[in-house]
């Protein structure tokens, strides 16, 4: 029974969070070079996510565990006018 409750709890947590690149006011990814502290602040403090770091190869912040209301960058709906 405890295992079943654990599985249900994990499924609920997974449904209520998302991962992705947070966007600035222009609809662009938040850029970074190697500054994990900045990305951690943006993702955790501002957007109420669980974790944030600078994804080096993309030169952009990446957030994990964001609430569903947080806007994340999507290639299909990209409106970035950098």
From Swiss-Prot:
InterPro entries: LCN-type_CS_alpha_beta_dom, Scorpion_toxin-like, Scorpion_toxin-like_sf, Scorpion_toxinL, Scorpion_toxinL/defensin. Disulfide bonds join 28-80, 32-54, 39-61, 43-63. Residues 18-81 form the LCN-type CS-alpha/beta domain. One of its GO terms (molecular function) is sodium channel inhibitor activity. GO terms for cellular component: extracellular region. The keyword Cytoplasm does not apply. Residues 1-17 form the signal peptide. It is found in: Secreted. This is Beta-neurotoxin Css9. It comes from Centruroides suffusus (Durango bark scorpion). The lineage of its organism: Eukaryota, Metazoa, Ecdysozoa, Arthropoda, Chelicerata.
